[in-house]
Amino acid sequence: MAKISTQYSHPTRTHPSVRTMDRDLDCIENGLSRTHLPCEETSSELQEGIAMETRGLAESRQSSFTSQGPTRLSRLIISLRAWSARHLHQEDQRPDSFLERFRGAELQEVSSRESHVQFNVGSQEPPDRGRSAWPLARNNTNTCNNSEKDDKAKKEEKEKKEEKKENPKKEEKKKDSVVMDPSSNMYYHWLTVIAVPVFYNWCLLVCRACFDELQSEHLMLWLVLDYSADILYGMDMLVRARTGFLEQGLMVMDASRLWKHYTQTLHFKLDVLSLVPTDLAYFKLGMNYPELRFNRLLKLARLFEFFDRTETRTNYPNMFRIGNLVLYILIIIHWNACIYFAISKFIGFGTDSWVYPNVSNPEYGRLSRKYIYSLYWSTLTLTTIGETPPPVKDEEYLFVVIDFLVGVLIFATIVGNVGSMISNMNASRAEFQAKIDSIKQYMQFRKVTKDLETRVIRWFDYLWANKKTVDEKEVLKSLPDKLKAEIAINVHLDTLRKVRIFQDCEAGLLVELVLKLRPAVFSPGDYICKKGDIGREMYIIKEGKLAVVAEDGITQFVVLGDGSYFGEISILNIKGSKSGNRRTANIRSIGYSDLFCLSKDDLMEALTEYPEAKKALEEKGRQILMKDNLIDEELAKAGADPKDIEEKVEHLETSLDSLQTRFARLLAEYNATQMKVKQRLSQLESQVKMGLPPDGDAPQTEASQP
């Protein structure tokens, strides 16, 4: 009976004890063998011995402790040497966190066992008396049992690290969200808010400074409004400091850079000056001096910015420009009226005929009369329409001269701006009317019938009434191709998807076709196509009613409405079609109809880049013809159409002619250049033989001089 020196008493079982120890050694060896072995050369002899012994054991099939003991011990020594060498010369490497995300449960369990085996083998704990004589096997058994707990702890640590990595990103996003985009709706709404206190200060500060009753009778109201405006001014500085700007096409979102950029602009200086607390002088001078707050007028740029943004956003820019111009004129007249009343107060009311009448008169002592009289005088002076009392003193003459100059500028501005606005508003109508006039003259010159002339004029009236006179290509030509494509997709893509043969096409082909759709408008009674005509276009009905009629043009078979389409088979040029590319029906417009047209040439040009889509479209068209029994199978299998071959040959001949022409031109240029080079070489040879310098370097002799 095999005995093991341990302090515990065990039953006399030989094979189970050997198996358990073998299993423990396997756990250790499997764990340590997964590590890198830098000292494999030093243990090669032991490995050879182990290999010989394992071969003998495999043949004999013996599993006793006496026969396998040396082999197990040798393996254990090799594993310990490899581990100690790696531990001394190489640091522990943490597995890649990115790869750990893709590990399965088995790989994670194996890796956890590795780490625990290495840890327990490397620990130099003194053996206890109550423990087994195989501490390594005991340690390995314990680590295998505790692997799940360690895996959970590792997962928790990884989650914490990932959260720490994600938290800065979230904080950066929060910081970026505070930055305001100057092209966003939020920024425009803030401009609307800040424009109110700016407009309030520009209109009422000067009025309160000139008319004392207005300031004294509503003092609390003005204090509330003034300091509310100051709060908005302060908030506007914060908004400006957090407003992004473009740098190399990208929006700058860094708060420190935004603040530095803002402090370097003129707006920052004006904003600071507009918030200087000059109204603290109220405590010394009194509350009836609102002119102390005139520094709040430095915020005028915000009002102009609001007007500019509104002009670009509104759908009626011409009307907005006219209203904006009238507002500027009213503000100038308002300021001029207040200054006139202030000058009259400085000179003395009623001292002469030019100043404001004496306020001792109850009729002229009212606040409303004071302002209206001053406004009336200012309007007459600036518009130079009516007559006003002549000035008497030098100060009055100087003020009137300045008013006349300002009035002339205002009058010129009004005439110029209003004239240009009206011309811009009527530009489209004038251009459209010019087209009608030219067509009328042509029809009169060619003596067109009255019926046809009436139809033409009605067609033009329909276009103008329904705002369909806009040339889309002319309007969109200034846009880049990307924006053109997006507008066309937004307008026409849903319409094109209704066509049966285009429903499963790839998006790139649909975009190409959308850009090639052309609008077409037909009058009542117009034939879109007739039976037997060559089909060069397909049509999609956007709005209106079309009728499939008989040869007489009256009998209606089918009425086509919005979203219907026809002619899609004829532009595909499918082989074996019984009708060829001919129209098979008469289609007539019942009323005014708006259609989209796609030509055969445009379709084929788009399909050159999509050969697979071309095959798919032809197959769909062939299936449609087969359902309607409109395809000849023999012709379809016969091969290429002779007409197509003739067209290709003609195209090749044309290309060959153009290439020959280009080659002849290039050959002539080459011969001419070669001739010039030969002449130049001959001249140089003759000069060298005669011993003369080249022409450009020949000195002028006295004989050559005049």
Curated annotation (Swiss-Prot):
Positions annotated to bind 3',5'-cyclic GMP: G567, E568, S570, R583, T584, D628
Span list, region Ion conduction pathway: 317-425
Keywords per UniProt: Calcium, Calcium channel, Calcium transport, Cell membrane, cGMP, cGMP-binding, Coiled coil, Glycoprotein, Ion channel, Ion transport, Ligand-gated ion channel, Membrane, Nucleotide-binding, Sensory transduction, Sodium, Sodium channel, Sodium transport, Transmembrane, Transmembrane helix, Transport, Vision
Gene3D superfamilies found in the cross-reference section: 1.10.287.70, 1.20.5.300, Helix hairpin bin, Jelly Rolls
Chain residue ranges for the region called C-linker: 427-504
Biological process per Gene Ontology, one example term: sodium ion transport
UniProt-listed InterPro entries: CLZ_dom, CNG_cation_channel, cNMP-bd_CS, cNMP-bd_dom, cNMP-bd_dom_sf, Ion_trans_dom, RmlC-like_jellyroll
Function per UniProt: Pore-forming subunit of the cone cyclic nucleotide-gated channel. Mediates cone photoresponses at bright light converting transient changes in intracellular cGMP levels into electrical signals. In the dark, cGMP levels are high and keep the channel open enabling a steady inward current carried by Na(+) and Ca(2+) ions that leads to membrane depolarization and neurotransmitter release from synaptic terminals.
Domains (record comment): The C-terminal coiled-coil domain mediates homotrimerization of CNGA subunits.
Protein's recorded name: Cyclic nucleotide-gated channel alpha-3
Gene expressing this chain: CNGA3
